[in-house]
Regions:
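N-terminal, positively charged regions that mediate nucleic acid binding
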Residues: 1-13, 17-24
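Structured core elements
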Residues: 3-5, 17, 40, 69-71, ...
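Glycine-rich, N-terminal phosphate-binding loop and its surrounding beta-alpha-beta segment
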Residues: 24-83
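Hydrophobic alpha-helical hairpins/lids featuring a short glycine-rich hinge
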Residues: 61-118
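Structured alpha-helical segments in the cores of large, soluble enzyme domains
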Residues: 100-101, 126-137
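Active-site helix-to-loop segments that bind/position phosphate- or nucleotide-bearing substrates
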Residues: 123
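Conserved small/polar residues in nucleotide/adenosyl-binding loops
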Residues: 140-146
Length: 150
C-alpha cells in the first residue's frame, strides 16, 4: 500500500492505494480507519462493461470529472456489505477476469471509478495515475487498484 499525491494546483490530496489482487479485510479496514475517505475500485472500461456498470450521473458535472459508476456489492458471500470483509469480497469478485453482471448487485458499499484510456496523459487524476503505476506489475489477473482519499 502506498500514498499517491497529486499536484497542489489540482486536488492537493493523497490517496491510499493498493492493488485489488492483494485485497483483504485488514487493508480495507486500514483504509476506512486511517484514510477515512470513500473506498473506491478503479476499473478499466472493459471490466466496467463486463459488470454492466452505468455512470452514477448521466451528465458528469463534477469539477474533476471523476467517472464514478453506481456502487456495487458482491451478490453472494456477504452479509450487510459494509464490513471490511464484505467490501474485500466485493472487490475480489468484481476484479475476476471471468466476472459478469450476474455476480454483483447495486447499490452497494464499493464505489467503482472508470479510468480513462491513455492514463495521466489524458486525465491527471488519482484514478489514472494508480492504473498507470499498476500496469507494469506482473500479476496473475487484472491489475486494478483500490483507492481511498486521505
Amino acid at each position: 500500500m502506498y500514498i499517491l499525491v497529486d499536484d497542489e494546483n489540482r486536488e492537493n490530496e493523497g490517496d491510499l492505494v493498493f492493488n485489488a489482487s492483494d485485497v483483504n479485510s485488514k487493508k480495507i479496514n486500514f483504509m476506512a480507519k486511517y484514510g477515512r475517505g470513500l473506498i473506491c475500485l478503479t476499473l478499466n472500461k472493459n471490466q466496467a462493461n463486463r459488470l454492466g456498470l452505468t455512470f452514477m450521473a448521466p451528465v458528469n458535472q463534477s469539477r474533476n470529472q471523476t467517472s464514478f459508476t453506481v456502487s456495487i456489492e458482491a451478490k453472494k458471500g456477504i452479509t450487510t456489505g459494509i464490513s471490511a470483509k464484505d467490501r474485500s469480497r466485493t472487490i475480489k469478485v468484481a476484479t475476476k477476469k471471468n466476472v459478469s453482471k450476474k455476480d454483483i448487485v447495486s447499490p452497494g458499499h464499493v464505489f467503482p471509478i472508470i479510468s480513462r484510456d491513455g492514463g495521466v496523459l489524458v486525465r491527471a487524476g488519482h484514478t489514472e495515475a494508480s492504473v498507470d503505476i499498476a500496469k507494469p506489475v506482473s500479476y496473475t489477473h487484472l491489475t486494478l487498484p483500490t483507492i481511498c482519499s486521505v
